[in-house]
Amino acid sequence: MAAPKLESFRRGSMFDGSFRRGSMFDGSFRQSMRDRLILQSRGYSNVNDDDKTSVRCCSYSYFSDKITGVVKKLKDVLVTAWEMGTADPRKMIFSAKMGLALTLTSILIFFKIPGLELSGHYLWAILTVVVIFEFSIGATFSKGCNRGLGTLSAGGLALGMSWISEMTGNWADVFNAASIFVVAFFATYAKLYPTMKPYEYGFRVFLLTYCYVIVSGYKTGEFMETAVSRFLLIALGASVGLIVNTCIYPIWAGEDLHNLVAKNFVNVATSLEGCVNGYLECVAYDTIPSRILVYEAVAEDPVYSGYRSAVQSTSQEDTLMSFASWEPPHGPYKSFRYPWALYVKVGGALRHCAIMVMALHGCILSEIQAAEDRRREFRNELQRVGIEGAKVLRYIGESLKKMEKLNPIEDILYEIHQAAEELQSKIDKKSYLLVNAKNWEIGNRPRVRDLTDEQKISNLDSDLSRILAHKSQSEATLRPPKNWDDVTTAANLSSATMLPYLQSRTMIHKQPSWPSRISITPGSMLQPPLGEPGKMYESASNLSLATFASLLIEFVARLENLVNAYDELSVKANFKEAVSE
């Protein structure tokens, strides 16, 4: 259907051009009507579309559609706002607290303080409430202290500079301009120092206050009144904001950090179980979501979103830790100088394990996959490691949530270490399944001929152990001599006498060669030998299984560091003793 439409469009364009030529050069009304009828017969009746569009723009249906669209969008916004508020009621409470703080500040400004006129600078109190009123108590204290210190230091420096500028006489303008440049240069350079990053807002307030006092005081000649009134109004706004935010349903950054780290334990455990179960069940993506390839959030994939939340929480943990350090003792965090930094350390150790889970998920997303029968050989061992690993993560996460120490009697890593050792032992025993065993052969071996397919299959299991023993023994005897000259001389002297013995020894220890891999299908018993590309793909697919098992063992090894980090946190934070069940 596409080709006729394209052809008709081209013919229509041709007649459209003839219509224009006829209108411009021929001037014949009959010719123009004839071209118009031809266009309409071919389905092109859009000669007066502009007129119809202009009429439709002024029609009732047009305005009705526009109003309906606006109402629909407004409804969607209201539904989204309601869902956000019900998902986290703290956001609605915080908004109400902000409105209350601004209202109280405005009311207090309306009362005139005897002997001091503040009406000309009342805006600074309102700006202070808007700026320092943050979601958490720690962030509010941080910005409030930064703003107060910046204002106080800048006001004192501005008063000193104004006193010096008065003594310069006619050079006061030049001195004030030069002082602004020098102060701005050093303050901006100082805030770029890495350790000064938490005080960046204080430096900004410092510059703003200094310039404001210098410029406004120069115009009015009242440097002292400008500095004092600004400081008092900022202190008023900061006090109202801190009191309202702290006394009415306080939101603590330390508690958010505690819950975030505990939640990440559960998310990583869910991802670990999903990766192991998905790999053993041969789960494959028909098409890998593009957002996974660029590491964006995908809520529909719990395996991906679980470990991603732990890996991506680095900046959030650092921010919450810096705010929590400003908060006074509260709730279960009653000690001064609470070890919030150790929460970040535990989160980093958990993130170190989550990276292994990400690599396990990458094995599922890989183009080359191991055969199902190969995975079935290691199913029990892989599944046990996944279950025990998820159990350890959930146990630590639950202990962190309850603020309990780990049980000193029970070793929580014992079971998973046993599972990892069983997996390693199974890999050692079945290592011929993970590589191309045919390349292991040393020397030529007689091939078993004149055997039927049924005989090869029946003898396969009995040959496995003998072949593996031969390979391991031959590898164990490969030790390079220290002096090759002695070996060559001895070989030349005894070659004639030892030849019968060597021949008999060779015949005794020769084993049947490792049979080529078989694939049993309903239609045939033995598949023909694979070509070179097929063998390469087969080896790569087997190595993918070895990669998955190795990553799982590495995950187990990294759990030790996680347990040590949690033990350190539980001791310094004075967690309660574990309840023995």
From Swiss-Prot:
One of its GO terms (biological process) is monoatomic ion transmembrane transport. This is Putative aluminum-activated malate transporter 3. Pfam families: ALMT. The keyword Transmembrane applies. It is a multi-pass membrane protein. Malate transporter. GO terms for cellular component: membrane; root hair. The gene is ALMT3. The chain crosses the membrane at residues 98-118, 122-142, 148-164, 167-187, 201-218, 231-251. InterPro entries: ALMT (IPR020966). Belongs to the aromatic acid exporter (TC 2.A.85) family. It is found in: Membrane. Keywords: Ion channel, Ion transport, Membrane, Transmembrane, Transmembrane helix, Transport.
